[in-house]
């Protein structure tokens, strides 16, 4: 079906999806501008919807403000704290949802006049939960998700005599396979040892446990999950299996292009980035697998929000419905930008069965769909971003300074417990 037809049907369907619809917006007679702040590649997805939007709202211009990922979230942090230069629609990555919700500057979309709670069953459960605060306010509507996956260079594994099962059977096996790969090809197992930590701490979290802090306010960073993550990261560093390369750096993309990084633990969306701009010349060399040791975890995801001080909330909500509640729009974004859909309706589409040329013809979308269905819904906590920084700093001390793991995690716990105590007062 042509893209234009998809978008026309998409808008028509999504405006009927809730009871809010056009009645809330009313007739738009005067010229208005709807501003949307986003980062790549959500900005391109939003821009692709403008032509169809204009057919319904010819007097509403859509201005998409695009910034690099970090710059976008820095700008939105400032805008929310000062209540100035706010867009009508703000796209937020999962890791920032709790931080932005903390200040109370985002609309609760779960209640009237938005009522997204009525559509809860249509979303991947863990994604909907990620946009919900501990108090039950739905401050962000999921658009795309990041089921965790292991991407690996099939050519490098073959050269080293390593099989996929060697990487995935266990985390210890993953590291051992890395030793063989490094010896045979010179390639690092991972870009940075922290990549292992990041996935392990997000894997197989129990309901109600939380990432860093549970529902009762108990700090979890000295639990077995974190000890295991730190031990594995340290083992990777001791075996010289990481290049100490930070994600999104020039060295990172060059490592993918030159074949000096054999695997990457990430969200499924990375396969699209590798294909589209990070390392398109490596088409056919990559494969995808589930995470080692039967782990399932979420890594990233994009959400739509409305600031409380936004000027055009009704129109903003119409746009958000169009982008999140329409199977056609979600599928279009999946096809064009590899934005894995948060809407369950789309998961039944035949597109999931199509081979991915970049991954050597593998039908990896089925793999990722299975992972998405097995990921536990994890409550967000407003101290998650702070906890992430504290834990990351302690890991650096372990990797770079030889700090004892239990001491590092105990120090991280003490710092976080003080923050939790202050928050409670």
Q: What is each of the regions a protein language model found here?
A:
Residues 52-123, 159-161, 166, 255, ...:
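Extracytoplasmic "Venus flytrap"/periplasmic binding protein-like
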Residues 114, 273-281, 294-393, 424:
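C-terminal lobe and pocket-closing loops
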Residues 177-180, 216-245:
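Glycine-centered hinge/linker elements that transmit conformational signals in sensory
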Residues 94-147, 175, 183, 204, ...:
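Hinge/lid segment of periplasmic solute-binding proteins
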Residues 158, 164, 370-425:
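Conserved C-terminal helix/tail region of periplasmic/extracytoplasmic solute-binding proteins
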Residues 200, 230-318:
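Extracytoplasmic/periplasmic substrate-binding proteins
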Residues 41-61, 391, 409:
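Short, polar/charged alpha-helical segment
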Residues 31-41, 60-65, 88-89, 139, ...:
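Short, well-ordered beta-strand elements
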């Amino acid at each position: 079906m042509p893209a234009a037809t998809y978008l026309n049907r998409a808008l028509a369907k999504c405006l009927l999806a809730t009871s809010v619809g056009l009645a809330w917006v009313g007739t738009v007679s005067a010229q208005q501008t709807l501003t949307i702040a986003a980062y790549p590649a959500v900005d391109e997805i939003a821009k692709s919807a403008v032509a169809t939007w204009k057919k319904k709202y010819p007097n509403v211009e859509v201005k998409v403000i695009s910034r690099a990922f970090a710059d976008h979230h820095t700008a939105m942090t400032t805008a929310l704290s000062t209540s100035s230069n706010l867009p009508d629609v703000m796209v937020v990555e999962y890791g920032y949802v709790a931080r932005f919700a903390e200040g109370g500057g985002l609309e609760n979309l779960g209640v009237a006049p938005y009522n997204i709670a009525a559509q809860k069953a249509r979303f991947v459960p863990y994604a909907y939960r990620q946009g919900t605060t501990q108090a039950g306010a739905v401050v962000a509507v999921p658009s795309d998700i990041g089921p965790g996956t292991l991407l690996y260079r099939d050519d490098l594994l073959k050269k080293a005599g390593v099989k996929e099962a060697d990487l995935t059977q266990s985390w210890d096996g993953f590291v051992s396979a890395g030793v063989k790969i490094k010896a045979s090809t010179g390639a690092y197992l991972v870009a940075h040892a922290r990549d292992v930590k990041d996935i392990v701490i997000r894997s197989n979290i129990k309901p109600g446990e939380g990432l860093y802090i549970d529902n009762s306010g108990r700090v979890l960073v000295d639990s077995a999950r974190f000890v295991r993550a730190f031990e594995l990261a340290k083992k990777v560093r001791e075996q010289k299996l990481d290049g100490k390369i930070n994600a999104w750096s020039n060295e990172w993309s060059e490592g993918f292009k030159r074949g000096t990084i054999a695997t990457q633990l990430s969200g499924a969306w990375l396969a699209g980035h590798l294909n589209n701009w990070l390392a398109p010349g490596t088409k056919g060399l990559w494969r995808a697998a589930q995470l080692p040791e039967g782990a399932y975890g979420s890594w990233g995801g994009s959400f739509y929000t409305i600031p409380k001080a936004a000027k055009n909330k009704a129109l903003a909500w119409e746009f958000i419905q169009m982008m999140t509640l329409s199977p056609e729009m979600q599928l279009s974004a999946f096809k064009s930008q590899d934005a894995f859909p948060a809407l369950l309706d789309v998961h039944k589409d035949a597109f999931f069965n199509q081979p991915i040329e970049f991954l050597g013809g593998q039908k990896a979308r089925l793999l990722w769909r299975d992972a998405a269905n097995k990921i536990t819904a994890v409550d967000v906590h407003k101290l998650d971003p702070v906890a992430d920084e504290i834990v990351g700093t302690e890991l650096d001390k372990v990797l770079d300074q030889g700090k004892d793991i239990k001491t590092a995690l105990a120090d991280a716990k003490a710092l976080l417990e003080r923050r939790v105590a202050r928050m409670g007062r």
